[in-house]
Curated annotation (Swiss-Prot):
PANTHER family xref list: KRUEPPEL-LIKE TRANSCRIPTION FACTOR (PTHR23235), KRUPPEL-LIKE FACTOR 15 (PTHR23235:SF120)
Pfam families: zf-C2H2
Keyword Zinc part of the UniProt annotation: yes
Protein's cellular compartments: Nucleus
GO terms classed as biological process: cellular response to N-acetyl-D-glucosamine; cellular response to neutral pH; cellular response to starvation; chlamydospore formation; development of symbiont in host; filamentous growth; negative regulation of DNA-templated transcription; negative regulation of filamentous growth
One GO term describing the cellular component: nucleus
Transmembrane segment boundaries: none
Deletion phenotype: Exhibits a high degree of filamentous growth and leads to avirulence in a mouse model.
Induction of expression: Down-regulated during filament induction and in response to serum at 37 degrees Celsius. Expression of NRG1 is also repressed by RIM101 and under conditions that repress CDC28 expression. The bacterial signaling molecules indole and its derivate indole-3-acetonitrile (IAN) increase NRG1 expression.
Protein name: Transcriptional regulator NRG1
Region: Disordered, residue numbers: 85-131
Compositional bias per record (Low complexity), positions renumbered to this chain: 104-131
GO molecular function: DNA-binding transcription factor activity; DNA-binding transcription factor activity, RNA polymerase II-specific; DNA-binding transcription repressor activity; double-stranded DNA binding; RNA polymerase II cis-regulatory region sequence-specific DNA binding; zinc ion binding
Length: 310
């Protein structure tokens, strides 16, 4: 900052006023002019010091050099001053708005068209005065989904036979055109087939009807000696004994009992009973076998004694 003293200037001004001067006194200090109006008539003229005399009479700490650097520094100081933000007028910021989309495009907005779409060439002043609401800016990016057909207009799904039938021929202007059915998705209605039929269509085997006929032919073409057939499972046997033994499986009858005295196991087949009896009379249980013999002998002796007594 520049420092200057104004004592000589004030003394000269006081002397001029005491003399009754009615002229205008102007003092230029850093671009500022002070004027003192007087009466219309001038009684006496008093010469005032010039601007150069005032500058030379004021003691300055440094030399005063009028240059553009001081003005540039002052302008920079005023520009970078932290008080300019509060002293200046409030700045109006314009938010960036998305570009308007044409209404003829397939991706049209679902919400009502805002002001930016109605007049795409808006001026900055208009956008500042009429900002778009938040919900309108948000819905500008909401695009409509492709329209789905009405449920009544949806064609019914093609059946299994229609999708696998032979290609159809259609004449258009005398020219034959081959139309092949497109392989559609398998719907639940087309999957209600027999597993045997689906397997026959996929692997080339016989159909369900042919399988049933072949099963009947196999039963008739079996060995003619198997005349005895089970009534429950239709299994055939060569002898009636085999059939009777097989019937015990269905009835649950266990006619054969283990001959061991303390064992009460029963079996439907005799060979199974004999195999079980060997568990009691094997080589590891010789003592048990001897006991069994003694028990049998005692049992036979008691029977003989009872007979003799009778």
């Amino acid at each position: 900052m520049l420092y200057q003293q104004s004592y000589p200037i004030t003394n000269k001004l006081l002397n001029a006023s005491a003399a009754g001067s009615t002229s205008t006194a102007s003092i230029i200090d850093g671009g500022c002019t002070l004027s003192k109006p007087g009466s219309g008539k001038t009684k006496s003229t008093t010469s005032l010091p010039s601007f150069n005399e005032l500058l030379t009479s004021i003691p300055l700490p440094n030399e005063f050099k009028p240059s553009t650097k001081n003005t540039n520094q002052a302008a920079a100081a005023t520009a970078t001053s932290p008080y300019n933000y509060y002293m200046g007028p409030p700045a109006q910021h314009r938010l960036p708005t998305p570009p308007p989309y044409p209404m003829s495009s397939p991706t049209t907005a679902t919400a009502a068209t805002p002001l930016s779409q109605q007049s795409p060439h808006l001026q900055p002043q208009q956008t500042l005065q009429q900002p778009q609401p938040y919900h309108q800016q948000y819905y500008n990016y909401q695009y409509a989904a492709p329209p789905y057909p009405h449920p009544s207009q949806v064609p019914p799904p093609a059946s299994y036979q229609q999708r696998h039938q032979q290609p159809m021929y259609q004449n258009t202007n005398g020219v034959p055109i081959i139309i092949r059915p497109s392989p559609g998705l398998i719907t639940p209605t087309s999957t209600t087939f027999d597993h045997a039929k689906i397997r026959s269509n996929s692997t080339g085997d016989l159909s369900a009807n042919s399988l049933a006929l072949s099963s009947n032919n196999n039963t008739q073409s079996k060995d003619p000696r198997r005349k005895h057939v089970c009534k429950v499972c239709s299994r055939s046997f060569t002898t009636s004994g085999h059939l009777a033994r097989h019937n015990r499986i269905h009835t649950g009858e266990r006619k054969h009992q283990c001959p061991w005295p303390t064992c009460e196991a029963r079996f439907a087949r005799q060979d199974n009973c004999n195999q079980h009896y060997k568990t009691h009379t094997n080589g590891k249980n010789k003592r048990n076998r001897q006991q069994h013999r003694t028990l049998e002998a005692s049992h036979v002796g008691t029977k003989y004694n009872t007979k003799s007594l009778v």
